Amino acid sequence: MRALFLLALGSIPALVSGQLSGSVGPLTSASTKGATKTCNILSYGAVADNSTDVGPAITSAWAACKSGGLVYIPSGNYALNTWVTLTGGSATAIQLDGIIYRTGTASGNMIAVTDTTDFELFSSTSKGAVQGFGYVYHAEGTYGARILRLTDVTHFSVHDVILVDAPAFHFTMDTCSDGEVYNMAIRGGNEGGLDGIDVWGSNIWVHDVEVTNKDECVTVKSPANNILVESIYCNWSGGCAMGSLGADTDVTDIVYRNVYTWSSNQMYMIKSNGGSGTVSNVLLENFIGHGNAYSLDIDGYWSSMTAVAGDGVQLNNITVKNWKGTEANGATRPPIRVVCSDTAPCTDLTLEDIAIWTESGSSELYLCRSAYGSGYCLKDSSSHTSYTTTSTVTAAPSGYSATTMAADLATAFGLTASIPIPTIPTSFYPGLTPYSALAG
């Protein structure tokens, strides 16, 4: 339970001072829920033998405790052969201290929580985990189930748990509100379609999370408002993003702050191709990157998605500031790449204190198209007519040098062998400790 009005709003520009619209997290503590009623899955048929299907036991324990209580999954190894859909909870929690191993082969969601309020999923030891064994699918060029999906969940938190090797996406928050996600490690295979965290909804704080994969690190989708994402470690990932954005996009009041990105697709991307609607009031602040394919990549003609009918998604009032580090090859992929729709130009953009230098060669490019505002290759004009400009930079920008993280991976995890369960880091951004100490 956190009253996040106490965040230092004075340090945030006025355009995004309302990034959170109220308090986030569960309304009742896990200890209070446990004191009301505790439903130990061992009492409902679970056996920690990594063989007996734990799905029915979790479902039964939830039914007994969903109206007020705590579902307890003790330490030990459990096999999940049938997926669990947990619905209609109120003032309930799941304490995951054991490790759940996927043995089932169905599609869908291994663990789904829906239509629930005042909810908490956590490990008291920071060692609770779900191992998806996605490599079994990926080695054959296929995908399977997603690990965790929350749908229409309000006043919630997910923390101190580990998600590993999802057959598809790792963690999705679908139309959720007033939530907090923190102190997590997510580790997946090195290919697309294995998203780390996808979130759409309202008033959600995601912080102190490490993601390894090759797709979304922490990504906001539409519709979304008042989302705060900070202290994120994209450690050989796809990188953080917004989108993809299509018809009737509605995204506003989004803050990403203190994001460290290593050997990823990009430091941040906003991706669309046609479509309609708006993205407004966005702050991308304090980013460090090394070894990434792209750095800032706003692409209104993103070729990896099929074009959507419409003039394009209108981006307005976007601020990018205090970015440092290096990029793999800034001459082939501009560190500043702002490509907006000619028929829906970006307006009121601010690029400030961006210092990214190429790791290969001695020059890099900045590219802007139909993008208006201040800084670098943006045009400052009220006409908002289409244009494209490319500038060549031949000297390293002042202040680009930035620290690395000791836990930066030397190589990605492959697709043909089991990915080990990691420990949750004690830092997710250089020089910062988590807002909340790890549990246990």
Swiss-Prot record:
GO terms for molecular function: polygalacturonase activity; rhamnogalacturonan alpha-L-rhamnopyranosyl-(1->4)-alpha-D-galactopyranosyluronide lyase activity. This is Rhamnogalacturonase A. Optimum pH is 3.5. Unstable above pH 6.0. Keywords: Carbohydrate metabolism, Cell wall biogenesis/degradation, Disulfide bond, Glycoprotein, Glycosidase, Hydrolase, Polysaccharide degradation, Secreted, Signal. It catalyses: Endohydrolysis of alpha-D-GalA-(1->2)-alpha-L-Rha glycosidic bond in the rhamnogalacturonan I backbone with initial inversion of anomeric configuration releasing oligosaccharides with beta-D-GalA at the reducing end. Coiled coil: none annotated. InterPro entries: Glyco_hydro_28 (IPR000743), Pectin_lyas_fold (IPR012334), Pectin_lyase_fold/virulence (IPR011050). The lineage of its organism: Eukaryota, Fungi, Dikarya, Ascomycota, Pezizomycotina. Glycans are attached at residues 50, 317, 385-386, 388-392, 394, 398, 401, 403-404, 416, 418, 423, 426-427, 436. The gene is rhgA. It comes from Aspergillus aculeatus.
